[in-house]
Amino acid sequence: MSSSEQQEVPGLNEKSETLASVTTNQDKKREELVIDYNVPDEFEYAEGGWKAWMAILGSFLGFFPTWGFFYTAGVMQNYIAKHQLATVSTSTISWIFSVYNFCLLGSFVFSGLYFDLNGARRPLILGNVMFLTGMFALGNCTKIWHFIVCLGILVGMGSGIASSPLIGVVCHHFNRRRGIATALAMNGGSIGGVVIPLMLRSLFDKSGYPWAMRSLGFLSSGFLVCSVLLAREDPAKLHKPEPGSLMRKSSESSFVRSFLSYLSGSFDYKALKEPKYLFCTLGCCMAELSTGATLTYITSYCEQVGYQDEDAFYIITVLNALSIIGGYICSLLADVLFGRFNVMIMINLLLGIVGFVMWLPFGSKGSGIMYAYGAIYGALYGSMLNLAPVCCGEISRVDEFGRRYSTMYALVGFTFLAGIPISGAIIGEGSLESYNNVIIFFSAVSIAAGVFYLLSKCFALQNPLKKNDTKESDFPGTLARLIKSSLRRF
């Protein structure tokens, strides 16, 4: 090598250091973007195996009676409005189902944090006992306050307390295939939504209302006992509080004291300061309100426009049956092709559009239209329910999922508490014009849900409101970032 080649070139080191610095900064930015894409954790997931699939089976069996009955709300509302509560107005009866939906969804918060710290068994036992007590007592209900206590509080709260751990155990065992796994577990509720209306319709005629409810209680008992035995968490993913913290102290005390302590800290206020979580929660509130109110009133709508009783029953059955198939297919597409948030956004927008272009103008033109609408709505609706916890998990650590998911559904419960009576008030005495107004309300709320999920996705990928370093206001840049984030797979 020549002496000139051995000499150090002036400025070369400085340029190399500058280039290395730029490269390092670019790498850091890429790392930050990856961190924004998915909430990182240090856990390993089975993605299958005996324990994981038994947990899925346990969740499936638990959802069959608890959420299967939730999907049957329209059948129950229509039946008691014509028999036990025939002299009571629609808006008054709607309070029963408003309390029921509020207790079911709001009581997630009672078990979410407890599951994160201690696992599934105790909240499952507590929730199942409450559910079965209310179910057996329903057979003796004759007054509105009877239904509020037994159906609204006991059945509703029992279902909600059991639901958070049933979803949580799925997230403990699956990450990459979480959408499909959640769909398989929650399809228990969809299948229950097919079986229970048919079962009740037959038993109402043959055995009468009291024994119909008791028979459903006996059937539910077998499913729920198996659920407690099979739905097990992964102990490695239980949240471990810091030494000396309130959670640590309460977890080492008695069950009653620990439950009260967990209850006081179970609502995750800090999470609501995250825009991605806040908009995800708002999207879930709007989506659940729209679909829950639709299930509650679609049966009475069918009877108002003159369709036969069996049509009202079977439309709900078709809706729930198609939710099984649609829920699995859309969850598979979410995991493999499009991303969980993208599918959730499309589903909610389509639910609103179908309401505007199909149910509103043509719902009263023939029962065949409502069967077709029920099939389309069910195919979309099933995947919406399956992906709600998956989207929450997409922006949450797995050891904090129970608390964040239950906080989200506590707010959904409050939305139901106001939304169902509002829907009942819009319907009023039940004229076709009033039902058309409530269809507009349902559809608009679904579209709003899609918009909120879109905003959540944008903030999860990159904050579109982040200011430019050199400008105080950068509206074109903000709009560009928003559009860019909205088009990405997530």
Language model features by range: what are they?
Residues 106-120, 326-340, 358, 427-428:
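Helix-to-loop junctions at the C-terminal end of transmembrane segments
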Residues 395-432, 442:
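A late C-terminal transmembrane helix in Major Facilitator Superfamily
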Residues 305-307, 311, 317-322, 327-329, ...:
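C-terminal transmembrane helical hairpin of 12-TM major facilitator-type secondary transporters
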Residues 1-49, 233-264, 459-490:
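Intrinsically disordered, low-complexity terminal tails of fungal membrane proteins
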Residues 65, 69-80, 269-332, 341, ...:
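Extracytoplasmic gate region of multi-pass secondary transporters
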Residues 64, 131-135, 145-161, 165, ...:
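Hydrophobic core of transmembrane alpha-helices in multi-pass small-molecule transporters
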Residues 106-146:
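Conserved MFS/SLC helix-loop-helix module at the cytosolic interface between two early adjacent transmembrane helices
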Residues 80, 152, 159-174, 181-182, ...:
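Intracellular juxtamembrane helix-capping segments at the cytosolic ends
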